[in-house]
Regions:
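A well-ordered secondary-structure block
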Residues: 34-138
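A short alpha-helix/helix-coil micro-patch that ends at or immediately precedes a cysteine
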Residues: 1-49
Length: 139
């Protein structure tokens, strides 16, 4: 996939290759309707309000509270991204975690304990997309 985006041939791409080999085969995510609802609602909230990207809603509700309200009580995380080109590019950038030394997005995507997911996106400004990926262990 990185061949489709030559500017992404960066040091993080090599570390991603290594992490993918180290992780080995991972189970497929199961779509969780609650996580889809949460991810889409958060994306729409941030996008429609043109708010600064973040894990808290525009009303101040944090990620943990949003998950608890849906009955997801443990083992959950969220990735967010903004892209002006495509949703696919947003996901690739989350795996690469360019300029993010803690590699938090990548760790979430490669965590074998996170088995359920929901994804949402919304237009962010004129030509960008705000992508939200919510993950949880099997509840």
């Amino acid at each position: 996939v990185l061949r489709l985006f030559p500017p992404l041939q960066v040091a993080e791409a090599e570390s991603l290759r290594n992490d993918l080999v180290r992780a080995g085969p991972l189970p497929m995510f199961t779509l969780n309707k609650k996580l889809v609802k949460a991810a889409q609602a958060h994306a729409a909230d941030i996008g429609q309000n043109k708010a600064a990207p973040g894990h808290s809603s525009t009303n101040g509700t944090n990620f943990e509270t949003r998950m608890n309200r849906l009955g997801i009580k443990h083992c959950a995380t969220e990735n967010i991204s903004i892209s002006s080109q495509s949703i696919l590019l947003s996901v690739i950038l989350l795996y690469l975690d360019i300029y993010l030394p803690e590699l938090g997005h990548r760790k979430a995507l490669l965590n074998p304990n996170l088995r359920e997911t929901g994804v949402g996106s919304a237009l962010y400004g004129k030509d960008q997309y705000f992508l939200v990926q919510d993950f949880a262990c099997t509840q």
